[in-house]
Amino acid sequence: LPDKEGGKVLNDPYFWFLLVSLVGLLGFVSIISLNTGLNHDELEHVHSAWYVANGFLPYGDFFQNHNPLIWYICAPLLGFLGETAASILAMRVICLFFMLGSLAVSLLITRRLTSSLPAGIVSLLLLLTSSFFLASAYQIRPDVPQVFFGLWGVYFLLLFIEKSSGARAVLSGMSLALSFLFLQKAVFLIGAAGLVFVFFNFRDRLPFRYLLLFGVSFAAPILAFLAVLFFNGLIEDYYITNYLVNLNRIRTFSPLRTISRFADRDYLFLIFALFSLPVLLLARGSDRKTGSLAFITLLMVFSIRFHDRPHSQNFLPMLPLLAIGLSVFLHRFFERFKTPAPAKILIMLLLIGIPFRNVLPKLHSSNRPRLEAIMHVVENTGPNDPVYDGNIKFNVYRPDLHYFWYSVNRGKLLDSYNRVTGNRFGKYDIYDLIFTRKPKFISLFDIDREDPRFEKLMRMYSSTPYLDIHRLNKEK
C-alpha cells in the first residue's frame, strides 16, 4: 500500500525520529521478553503444555478453564528441548513472535486507514511504551495469540468493507474463530466484528453468500474443536470448567480497580485514545472503515464491565485498537493543521516518553531465580514423582497430587467448581493428599498452619534454599 507522502517521507525528520524510536523499542522489548520474571499464569500454561505433551487430556485428566490451542502449539517444544529452562524460554519466544505479529497487523490496519507509514509506526510506539500492554503482551498466555488472530479478523473485515469479496469474508471469519480457540474472551471482539459485518451486508444489500461464507468459516474450526472434545468424551468437562466455573466465580472485583491502574500509568494514551474514538466515529467525512474500527473499539472498551476479574491481560485485545484509533486521529490532526516536524516530534515525545518511565523497571526483573527453582525440582525427582505446588511457582514438569492443581485456596476456582458440580471435590484435603502420596517437594501455599497436622507435616519436610519449596526428608 503506497504512502500518500511518496518519497517525501524519507526526507522527513519526523519519520526518522519514529523509525529510530521503533528500532530501539523493539530491541528493548526483545531483551526484556527473555529476561523478565515468569508470572505464575505463564507457568500454568507451561505445565498444561507438559501435560498435553505427555498424553493427558485437558478438562478430563487435569483441570483447566481456558481454551487449549496454545498448549498444543507449545507442547512440541518439550519434545525438541526436553524438560528444561530452554523450553520455557522458547515458549516465551513463540509468544514474542505473536506479539510482533500483532504489531505488524496493527501497522497494516493503520496504513490501510491513513495510507501513511509514519501513522502506522505511531500505533506501534504507543503500544511499545504502554506498561499495560507490555505487562502481558509477550508472556506465555493464550491472550497473546488471541490478540494476533483477532486483529487479523478486524483487518480482513475492514478490507471487506472497502471491497466485498468471498475470500475476505472467509479470512475474517476464520481468523476470529482461531482467536476464540486460544481464549473464550474473544467473544467480545467476535460479537463487535460480527455486528459490523452483518450491518454492512444488509446496508449495502450484498449477496447472502457473504454472510454464509463468514458464518461457515467462523463455525468450521469451532465445530472441529467440539468434535474432538466429543470423541474424547470431554464435552461435559469442558462445559463445566470453561463456562459454568468461569461464570460462577466466587471472588470477583470491579473493573475500576484495574482501570485506575491503567489510567495512573498510561493516562495520556488512555485520555487521548478515548477522546479520538467518538471523533473518528461521528466526524463529518469519516470513512466507513475508520468509523467501523472506532465502533468496534468502543464496544471493546464497554465490554470490560462484563469481566468479573479484569486483570491487565483482559485489556490486551482493545489496546492495539485504541493505539490504531489514536494514531489515525493524530495523523488527521497533523494533516489538517499542517503541523511542522519539530512540533510532531515534541507531541510524540510526550505521548511515548512519559509512559515509558513505567516500563523501565522491567530491565531489573530476572527470571533466573524462578528457572533455577524449577530445574532444582526436576533434577531431584523422577518423571512420575508427584509435587504439590498450589500457586504454580516451581512445578511445571512433574505430575500433581490432584485433578485440581491450582486455584485451590478458599473462594477460588475449586470452590466455584464444587458449587456447580454438587460438591464433587468437596472432600479435597491437602493434608490427606500429602500424607498419602508423600510428594518429594511441596509448597506451604493454602496449607492451614493452625491445623493440628501442621506439626507432623513440618517434621516430614525441610526447607530448601528456594523460597517456599520444602523437600521430603529421607526416612530413617
Segment roles from a protein language model:
Residues L19, G24, V93-T114, T129, ...:
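Transmembrane-helix motifs of polytopic, lipid-linked glycan transferases
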